[in-house]
Structure formats: C-alpha cells, structure tokens
Amino acid sequence: IRDYYASRGLGDVYKRQLKDLLETIRIAKQNDKIAGIYIESGLLSSGSASLEAIRRSLIDFKESGKFVVAYADNFTQGNYFLCSVADKVFLNPQGILELTGLASQTLFYKGLMDKVGIEMQIFKVGTYKGAVEPFMLDKLSEANREQIQSYISTIWDNITEGIAESRGISVNDINHYANEGLFFADPVKTVECGFIDELKYKPEVEAY
C-alpha cells in the first residue's frame, strides 16, 4: 500500500477514497493468495480520524496471521502512528522520525480590525463558544483554552497509547522522547529506543 495521501490532489495513480482502501485491506485479509501488506509511507496529510480507521483495519488484517511491513524515507508523526502497527518498521538510514507532540495555534484579528475601523456584530451564547473569539479578543479565553487542551490531549493520548501497545514502549517514555525531540538528530536513536526495528534503504526492504 503506497501512501496515496502523500500526493492527494495531484492526480496520482494511487489516489483512493478512504473507504476503498479499507475495503481493499478487508479483501486482502480474506484472499489466500496475499501473504501480507507492505506499506511504503510518504508524507501523510490525512487527519487523525482517517489514520485511526486505517490503523484499526491493519490490526484486523493481522489477525489473519499475515504480515505487515512498513518503510519510509522519513516518518512524520502521523504516518509513524499508522505504521507502528506493522510487524517490522524500517527507516532509511538517512531519515528522521518526527515525534514532537501536538500543538494548536489561534490567529486573532481584533487588533487588525480595530486599526482599519471594522466593528464585528457578534452574538455569543454559552461559555464554550470559541469560534468567534478571534474577532472579539486578543488572546484565548480560559474556557476556550480548556476545550482546545482537552481536544488535543485526547488525540495525543490515542497516539501514544496506540504506539505503546504496538511497540512495547511505555507512554511515559514516548512523552519523554517527544519532549526531547531527539529523532531529528540521530536515526540510530530510533532503533535504540524501540521505535524502529532496523535502518534500511528501500531496495533492502523490498528484498526483505
């Protein structure tokens, strides 16, 4: 399965709808002529919900006893979360693994609108209604900060727990490595810490 998300919108031959990919994995599980799945992962641009759906489908595929092998020149945080479910995860010896956690940034327009003389007419009901805040405030309200933090934490917890279960690494260690951002500097560290099985070039993986 080559990463069709990497070139989404560019007319690439591997472009598919999510439901088609999930159906393909389901059929592959039942097809006795298919021994396993090889994931060649590029730079994912998919959302967390789609990644989770594909990942769950791959977990279901593995219940058949068939293998899943993953390779990337570079792993973004999203595609590593997906590929961590594989039996073997390979990284290019010159590659990086991005694992830096999640963050959210909000742009505020009130100052600009004040300068150009634009006055917004806003009707806001309820505490946790943050959509209009960029037009009426110059920073996050505590309520909006709370709900954004809750949303991000839920996604991050799902990522770390999934990786921990698949790779046998504790959630605490994953959070530590993410905070340190070590993997940008040294791909060997990804193997030492258990995130990557081996550093191999693409032809070596294809011959695996």
Where are these regions (language model features)?
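Single conserved hydrophobic/aromatic residue that forms the stacking wall/gate
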Residues: 1-14
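Generic non-transmembrane alpha-helix signal with a bias for helix starts/N-cap capping motifs
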Residues: 21, 54, 76, 106, ...
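Charged, glycine-interspersed solvent-exposed loop segments at helix/strand-loop junctions
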Residues: 110-187, 191-208
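Residues within well-ordered alpha-helices
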Residues: 1, 24, 57, 79, ...
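Flexible, acidic/glycine-enriched loop-and-adjacent beta/alpha segments
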Residues: 69, 73-129, 198-208
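Membrane-embedded segments
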Residues: 17-88
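Extracytoplasmic
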Residues: 32-36, 49, 63, 75-78, ...
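Second-shell loop/turn segments in exported
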Residues: 15, 40-48, 67-73, 95-100, ...
